[in-house]
Amino acid sequence: MRIAILLHERDRGRDLERYHVFQLAQHWRQDGHQVLPVFGTTHFVPADVAILHIDLSLVPQRYRDFAARYPLCMNRAVADIRKTAISRQAVRSGDGWAGPVIVKSELNAAGGPERVNAGLLARSLGKLRGGWA
């Protein structure tokens, strides 16, 4: 089986082993599967299954469209993993909660990937809100 791991174009040349999916890929290879990293959306690499792994809180539409070309793609429907998009469990001013809380950033990994890929967050937010980009 051919497994394509779809990555952001800016991940090319970076240490991919920091992503858990590449640790899993070692096991898939040992089981005889071919695992192929695919960077960006300009070159389609045929595969039986794909895993969309874009290290951003908001996945750009072009990556989701590209992922749709694969017969089966894990994470294809996951466009937004910001805390407010995935959880309603938030304490807000006036809630009257006096107990302990866990403080999380709105963005995945405290927005680190967005800072590394400067400008991507602003463009993504603008598109989601129908604004500039």
Which residues does each predicted region cover?
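Active-site nucleotide/adenylate-binding loops and adjacent lid/helix of ATP-dependent enzymes
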Residues: 6, 57, 67-133
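ATP-binding N-terminal substructure of ATP-dependent carboxylate-amine bond-forming enzymes
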Residues: 1-71, 79-82
